[in-house]
């Protein structure tokens, strides 16, 4: 990205240390935004911060557990104090569990919902206080095409991402009069650490790719243009939408 669509703006990206979160942070920085980077791993965040700074933008590293209310509050406070405000929130932190329901312990279910749903709620609530007060802002929630599919062994993940889609729609209506747009991006299979084990199994990967008309997984960088669109002025009259980017898998 070389345009300055987001010049003068500040973004928070959760789960920013790798995969789609890293791609989002670099895309927003490439479009001119300063970026607060949040995730559990400080080492990963420091590497991404260096890449953001190489693009000429400021980066703020804030190790954060998005399921912890106080930690999320600190993330927002440090962003406002360190970078001067908040204009964009990207809720990307997420986990997956591939356990059939009858074998899945409640703790496994809770782990998925705590990160994917509670984490999205906490960050949106904390950042939203600033966005609503200033009368402008963007929230981009990372959902999944699994929100629209029944996938055996993924009840918790599918349900959690469907919750993110419903939350997106609700907050878009609630905050529309405050000029805050809330949209979601629903990737399909994208080559990240979340599916590294799957990709290491040639037979399992081949089975997955047969369900994708494009016959391949996406790359994190292919999500970047959508991040900039949903975080920038091109989406000023777009809210409550979930954009599916999955190589045609949901269209089948």
Language-model features, listed with the residues they occupy:
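Short C-terminal tail/terminal secondary-structure segment
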Residues: 2, 149, 228, 239-252
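Conserved glycine-rich cofactor-binding loop
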Residues: 10, 17-19
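Substrate-binding pocket helix/loop in short-chain dehydrogenase/reductase
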Residues: 72, 100-101, 105-113, 208
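Short, small/polar-rich loop/turn modules that mediate ligand/substrate recognition or access, typified
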Residues: 90, 176, 181, 238-240
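Active-site helix of classical SDR
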Residues: 124, 160, 168
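Alpha-helical segment proximal to the catalytic Tyr-Lys
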Residues: 129, 173-177, 236
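Residue(s) in the substrate-gating loop at a strand-loop-helix junction
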Residues: 144
């Amino acid at each position: 990205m070389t345009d300055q669509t987001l010049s003068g703006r500040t973004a928070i990206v959760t789960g920013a240390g790798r995969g789609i979160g890293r791609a989002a942070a670099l895309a927003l920085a490439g479009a001119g935004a300063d970026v607060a980077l949040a995730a559990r791993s400080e080492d990963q965040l420091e590497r991404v911060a260096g890449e953001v700074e190489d693009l000429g933008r400021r980066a703020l590293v804030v190790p954060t557990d998005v399921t912890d209310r106080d930690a999320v509050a600190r993330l927002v406070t440090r962003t406002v104090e360190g970078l001067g405000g908040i204009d964009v929130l990207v809720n990307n932190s997420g986990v997956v569990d591939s356990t059939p329901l009858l074998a899945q312990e409640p703790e496994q279910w809770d782990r998925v919902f705590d990160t994917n749903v509670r984490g999205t709620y906490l960050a949106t609530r904390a950042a939203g206080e600033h966005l609503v007060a200033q009368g402008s802002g963007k929230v981009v929630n990372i959902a999944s095409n699994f929100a629209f599919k029944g996938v055996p062994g993924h009840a918790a993940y599918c349900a959690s991402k469907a919750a993110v889609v419903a939350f997106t729609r609700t907050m878009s209506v609630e905050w529309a009069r405050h000029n805050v747009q809330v949209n979601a991006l629903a990737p399909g299979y994208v080559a990240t650490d979340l599916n590294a084990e799957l990709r290491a199994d040639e037979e399992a990967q081949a089975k997955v790719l047969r369900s994708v008309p494009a016959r391949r997984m996406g790359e994190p960088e292919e999500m970047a243009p959508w991040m900039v669109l949903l975080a920038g002025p091109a989406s000023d009259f777009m809210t409550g939408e979930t954009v599916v980017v999955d190589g045609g898998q949901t269209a089948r």
